[in-house]
Amino acid sequence: MSDANNRRGAGKGLLGRCADFLDDRTGYRALVHEALFERVPGGARWRYVWGSTLVFAFMTQVITGLFLWASYAPSAQTAWESVYYIQHEMTGGWLLRGIHHFMAQAMVVLLALHLLQVVIDGAYKAPREVNFWLGLVLMMLVLGMALTGYLLPWDQKGYWATIVATNLAGIVPFAGPSLQQLVVGGPDYGHHTLTRFFALHAGFLPATLVLFLVVHLALFRKHGLHARQPITRPDAMFWPDQVLKDAVAMLAVMAVVLGVILVPAVRTMLAGGQVDWGHVGAELGAPADPSESYAAARPEWYFLFLFQFLKVFEGWGATGEFLGAIVVPGLIMVVMFLMPIIGNWRLGHRFNVAFTFGIVAGAGLLTALALNEDYCSLWIDKESLADAEKLHDEAGGDEAKIAAALGHDPAKISAMRKKLARLEAYRNSQAFLAASRQAESDAARAVELAGRPERIPPTGALDLVRHDPLSRGPRLFGLREGKDCASCHAHVDPRSAEAAAQLAAASAPNLHGFGTVGWVRGLLD
């Protein structure tokens, strides 16, 4: 060690000398100083925290994802089973999975806030155009990770929602069918679909995101923060004020995520109930079953806007799907990539701000409409639709008969059409809610079967569910769909309130209590 270094280390403790040793060989102090003592135009502001919270959320996803990976088995016969193990048996697995699940949703919200802040502040203008384009690429990568992660539990909800999403890939002109087969891994959905989605979710997309993120941050360091004009406050350093604001925002994001996970459990405890921690956090549906349709299939809430938007083109067939799923979203992304150029026009920045707010507001409105369609029966007064329901059923839905029953009065016909539309919305909502309740029941039964002393057989949880008399019996009988045996036979306790209506509609014996002494006596009477 040189005399200068000896003098510098004189009087320092072991940690100080170790720090000097590392600094001599790495120069880390200069790097830390450059990172922390960057000038912030106009001083620290809360509006600058969104980029940092996004990086924090992504790092949380990486850490929790690696721990989940250690216990996850990506195959059609072991995926659901390994997620069941994580959720219900691994110590703290429910919390780990809950943080990963809800932090992914938080990232989508943070993306929207960060995009709004960048556009409002004009941080896409020269010389930051390339960094803005990189940000848009990062946004698409995050959404891709959210989409591919949906299938990995290999439950009914993720399986059927993924089928809808991948079918959209098939409508791309020329390359659509080949692209769909490439993503799915063959002509049918199965093991190769799952392994490809897992490779995308845990390997290719995160690695690509890290690469683009490094370049994004490097360009951000090169150009510095862009402050809204005019600047009314003096500049300050990144440390300590902006670092403190960023840290508070990160803690707030984690607090919200933990709150979403834990609040239901806290409510149960306050009510004096027993908390089953395996049912806290991210849900786990019944094992994916290609032979069983799933009427409650929906994308996650942040993709509901696209699901609802496609309904605008419902009557247009394949052309409508192509316009709604490919053309319109593609044009929106083109406009966003052109924002740095548009911003140079006289009113370009105002157009960019208005366009971005319009997209966010439109997505919010479409999401609200989708939720309203699914849950409107909870607040629609069915009694107010009684006359419309009676008329519709008597006329068999025939508009000519309905018009005749109303005396061909235009005002009455118009009013009745509105009521019939509400009636249809009510019935569709009821069907969705019934399917959701059935899905919850099936999921609870699957978890109950998997937790029995016999455990999950080598053939997998789906085989366990398929051989369960309690859940398969009603399906075979046709109780849920009103078909098969249930199309003729009733299955209702004769003493119940609804017995009279069901027995009157039945054309064959009531099979409630089949094989019991009471049933045989009733048959012989």
PLM region spans:
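Electrostatic cytochrome c docking/interface patches
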Residues: D398-H408, Y426, E440-R480
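Membrane-proximal N-terminal segments immediately preceding the first transmembrane helix
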Residues: R25-R39
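Alpha-helical transmembrane signal-anchor/signal-peptide segments
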Residues: G272-Q274, Y375-G396, A400, A411-A446
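Membrane-embedded alpha-helical bundles of multi-pass integral membrane proteins
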Residues: E38-R47, S52-A70, S82-H100, L113-D387
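Periplasmic/extracellular electron-transfer cofactor-ligation site
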Residues: P474-A508
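Short, non-transmembrane cytosolic segments of multipass membrane proteins
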Residues: M1-L22
